[in-house]
Amino acid sequence: MTDTPLSLIRNFSIIAHIDHGKSTLADRLIQACGALTAREMKNQVLDSMELEQERGITIKAQTVRLTYPAKDGKVYTLNLMDTPGHVDFAYEVSRSLAACEGSLLVVDASQGVEAQTLANVYQALDANHEIVPVLNKIDLPAAEPERVRAQIEDVVGIPADDAVEISAKTGINIEGVLEALVQRLPAPTGDAEAPLQALLVDSWYDAYLGVIILVRIKDGRLKRGDRIRMMQTGATYHVDQVGVFLPKMQSVESLGPGEMGYINAAIKTVADCNVGDTVTLDKRPAEKALPGFKPSIPVVWCGLFPIDADDFEKLRDSLGKLRLNDASFHFEAETSAALGFGFRCGFLGLLHLEIIQERLSREFNLDLIATAPSVVYKMHMTDGTVEELHNPADMPELSKIEMIEEPWIKATIMVQDEYLGPVLTLCSERRGIQVDLTYVGNRAMAVYRLPLNEVVFDFYDRLKSISRGYASFDYQMDGYEESDLVRISILVNHEPVDALSFISHRTVAEQRGRSICAKLKDLIPKQLFKIAIQAAIGSKVIARETIGALSKDVTAKCYGGDISRKRKLLDKQKEGKKRMRQFGKVEIPQSAFLAALKMD
């Protein structure tokens, strides 16, 4: 395969809100360029994970190389990166954007600009992308291309008079998109003679080949048989195979500047492939690394514990493999008195957490218990040190803490104006502070500052239900602020259960304590003695529920006779119950853990 001249290469990604049709557009582009035969074509070619097909969302960024004979008579090579649209996978998006020079901004002509469209466009503009707006679903009766054009100009602030109007589903005007790519996006720059500099965009684990890495070549050339070096870790490897995705893997002799492809180098240690690292040649290394992208900082932490303690090592191994494939996921070992050995894991958000849990159970057959998600707090101690708190159970006594800071976010919510009232009420209930409120046509855009702790549990679900699914939501971290926070411990039979403790603002502590106690009362099975369920802040109990004892009629065998006979039996039973209360262990079923942690 000879090298394509730089002027004939276009690297682009597709950015859009969830469900605006970017994976379908990717399918049509692949079809139009004849990369797959009609028999191999299926819907959402690039969403290769079973989970992606099922939920209809893109989780992993995928890449494919297409050849397109344009109207000007030249044959172009197009490298497409399909990116996720959901806020929790923003890290995947930033990686794909770093590897491209331009983007297609897909907007649903019947729905208009959504919050995540906005967030991703700003990321693309930060990466100095040329952006081509595309209006999708123009075949729908509800499509209003003119209104959406005006909206793109007002809200996003990029000219949309030459936006390409298409329908990805029916294939209308796909040619127009390909022409716009070739005409309007810049060609990559690079020098084939310079030392090799390649950005490591992604890596994953293949059962046969070991670790495979996806790179975007900036300068230099990479061929089979080279010895490569990772600039961050200094690890060196012998390249067994270089190739491209057409979407199927196809090996090539070499990759030159501006191209995207994969390397297989028998990499066995997962830790050596840091996404965002620069790959260079061992014998003629580049002087400095490429600017990667900022490492992702986990926002939500939760504990994952194997139900069967023997699966602990298997869980460690599986998490390592997932970490390779998803660089925004972090984990460290921890132990819990109630649940045994497990891991404290960091995620970018709740959907991310759910997807990782689902992938662990599907791809690695693990049965797991997850504890309540919590955010990272900063504790300023009385001795002047600052500590991070990932797990509510580790919070020291209040006397040792000077103050606690909690993370805040800046949330952008876009919603039809008829649902604005309930949305604003929800935000203020969650201690939100309104920053801005603007109207574009019949839609409102509200910008709020909210404590992340209030958003973690079920904010997104509540937002969707009060707006009948119309509201869209996106957020960025917005620093830390001092707050009046307390740890609520849950005691069952006067024993604290560490996996159920959580941190809450003092104003809502009592209400949350009551609701968890009430839930546990319904979920913990009755014993032969009374069980007290309490919520406490320090030593002060703020809520209590009691589960009644199962009654056993010990006097059933007495017919008539003296009362002292019955009294003797009842006293004996009383004595036994007292002893049970002292030594009896209350088993909390797994379903109780899960249900208690879902906040209403």
From Swiss-Prot:
Disulfide bonds: none
One term of GO molecular function: ribosome binding
Membrane-spanning residues: none
Keyword Ribonucleoprotein in record: no
EC class name: hydrolase
UniProt cross-references to InterPro entries, sorted A to Z: EF-4, EFG_III/V, EFG_V-like, EFTu-like_2, G_TR_CS, LepA_C_sf, LepA_CTD, LepA_IV
Cited CDD domains: EF4_II (cd03699), EF4_III (cd16260), LepA (cd01890), lepA_C (cd03709)
HAMAP family: LepA
Name of the protein in question: Elongation factor 4
Species in which this protein is naturally found: Gluconobacter oxydans (strain 621H)
Gene name for this UniProt entry: lepA
